[in-house]
Amino acid sequence: MASTNDHPGESAAGDPVKLIAVRDSALSVDEVFRALGDDAAGGVALFVGTVRNHDGGADVDALGYSCHPSAEAEMRRVAEKVVAEYPVRALAAVHRVGDLTIGDLAVVVGVSCPHRAEAFDACRKLIDDLKHEVPIWKHQRFSDGTEEWVGAC
């Protein structure tokens, strides 16, 4: 992603979209929470998506995420849409790619807003739209030896 400062994935001063990244290393809830700090915000909402041990009645052993090169740009587009719809003071979203195991963090998103109801609503919109609009794919491997690709995480 093109950045206007020396820290890739981070925004320029004044931009409520503080952190957008796709990473092949472990994610940090603390990093996302720190990015959401704003003295005018009374509510901060976070969503942390983890790798679960089952899907559709089948036992999951592991999974991998892959993405299109445009994934970060699409994440930013989704983030800007949320910022336009809600009174967001700060927003951050980070998604993992590569091989993950049960319990690993797959995605961490969050928003800060003046009030809690707005923060909850904006965070839900952010994760739902990321899931449906950003070109990130999940490759699940099941304990019975089968596997499945799931489009747009």
Show the residue positions of the predicted features.
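N-terminal, polar/charged subdomain of small-to-medium soluble alpha/beta proteins
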Residues: 1-106, 114-124, 128-153
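Phosphate/diphosphate ligand-binding glycine-rich loop within oxidoreductases
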Residues: 109
